[in-house]
């Protein structure tokens, strides 16, 4: 309603409206003041999203919590773009890896994933894209398929599909940036690109 108080606490790399500790405290203060707080989180609250920290902090202060579940962008965005993360005879598993660890470095799991036949989904990795590609170039062929999807499923979605050797140029050509997910693996080669679906949600295709 119009009487609802809305407080923006969003985060982008290097630009935080509030620190995580401040967000935790704000949840408690507002719950004690109003009796009811909705913490609306973008992205994936329980996949690199620190959602459990907020719940723990609230419950430590005697505030009951409830979770409204959603679909992870790591699964939903590839699916909406016709990309299966597993496929018989092609990929038996998939990895979901953060592009930015708590010490702001690329996860060491990327090197392990690059040596696997699994599909790899990297979240928050655009600012380390060249480092990721360099690791893969040490372990995989240049024709390894890669998809990068910015603002997945939204009307301003951008998507490029290329290979290990071409994806960097495509990203620059179409000016992709964060927030985006990086999908690496042979299942990308078999993507079913549903143009009708993309048009129905207002996506202008560029790939």
Residue ranges and their predicted role:
Residues 42-116, 158-161:
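Class I SAM-dependent methyltransferase SAM-binding "motif I" and its flanking Rossmann-like core
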Residues 22, 32-38, 50, 93, ...:
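A contiguous loop/helix-start segment that scaffolds small-molecule binding in enzyme catalytic cores
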Residues 4-11, 62-66, 85-92, 141-148:
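Short hydrophobic/aromatic-enriched beta-strand-loop microsegments
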Residues 1-68, 166-168, 180:
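Class I S-adenosyl-L-methionine
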């Amino acid at each position: 309603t119009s009487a609802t108080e809305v407080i923006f606490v969003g985060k982008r790399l290097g630009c935080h409206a509030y620190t995580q500790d401040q967000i935790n405290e704000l949840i408690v203060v507002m719950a004690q003041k109003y009796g009811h707080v909705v913490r609306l989180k973008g992205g994936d609250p329980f996949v690199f999203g620190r959602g459990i920290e907020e719940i723990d902090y609230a419950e430590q202060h005697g505030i009951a919590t409830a979770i409204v579940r959603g679909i992870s962008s790591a699964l939903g965005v590839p699916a909406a773009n016709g990309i299966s993360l597993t496929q018989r005879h092609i990929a038996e598993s998939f990895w979901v890896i953060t592009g930015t660890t708590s010490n702001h470095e690329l996860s060491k799991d990327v090197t392990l994933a690059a040596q696997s036949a699994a599909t790899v989904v990297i979240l928050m990795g655009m600012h380390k894209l060249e480092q990721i590609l360099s690791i893969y170039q040490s372990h995989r062929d240049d024709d390894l398929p890669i998809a990068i999807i910015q603002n997945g499923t939204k009307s301003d979605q951008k998507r490029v599909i290329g290979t290990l050797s071409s994806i960097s140029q495509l990203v620059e050509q179409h000016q992709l940036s964060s927030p985006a997910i990086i999908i690496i693996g042979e299942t990308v080669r078999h993507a079913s690109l549903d143009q009708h679906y993309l048009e129905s949600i207002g996506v202008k295709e560029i790939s």
